Amino acid sequence: MAVRECMAFFADVDACARVPPTALAFSKHEEFNSGAKKLGSFQAYCPHDCSAEDMGSSSFDVDDVHAIACLDIRLFNQDRHAGNLLVQRSTSEDEPSQLTLVPIDHGCCLPELEHMDETTFAWMQWPQAKLPFSAKIKAYVTSLDSFAQEEAMKQYIRPPAKALATLHVGTLLLKKCVAMGLTAFEMGQLLVRSSLAMPSPMECLVAQLKHLDPYSHIHLYLRVFEVALDKLVRRMFPRTTNVVCADNGWTIQQPTQQEFAARKSYAKVLLSSAA
């Protein structure tokens, strides 16, 4: 769990979601059951007023929620509840108070691909999750490169191979779904179980690819995964839409065949950066 806490910090490129600085630390104390050093994560303390469970979700900035949603989706977060979203309130004499969300507790991120049954996102119940991503968030997602992040991580920690595979798959999934016009809520529908006994669409997709080894052949796995994901998204959301803001409110635009054809293969983009 400690290593995954650090991986979440590295994955939050440019502190887009505001994950606090996190590092690994060894600790030893005479009161411990064992005299051996213990490894844990050490995270900068973030002063805060409360957590998201103490406030109405409509108070939060849309881009803040979307940035955290993108991080959670990439990491297949299995413990995102309102209690581990800290709320900071900034006050100014000239401006009304502003609320900022700070996500913590990422030890249950990046599960093995075969064990994603506990993926959960509190923000799926928030209205912001059903709104389209801004141009800023879209540009950020487009710039993500999990292979470059892997190299950066390896300079400081030893990330587990299975956690890295999940990061690569999650990054591809996020980039592909954002390009296809899905909202954070719709992506959540792909990853989160609708009932305890029913596997999520993502779990079913991974099960279909069990003949492939993502840990020793990640490049091949990503190529096959992208094709399967494309089919899954089109089946679940047959009229994949783009939502734009018009003068009279939110309107829906259907993508043209040319737009569908022009969409990139994000597996190729990721893999070219790893070459």
Name the predicted role of every residue range.
Residues 1-78, 82-275:
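ATP-dependent kinase catalytic cores of phosphoinositide-metabolizing enzymes
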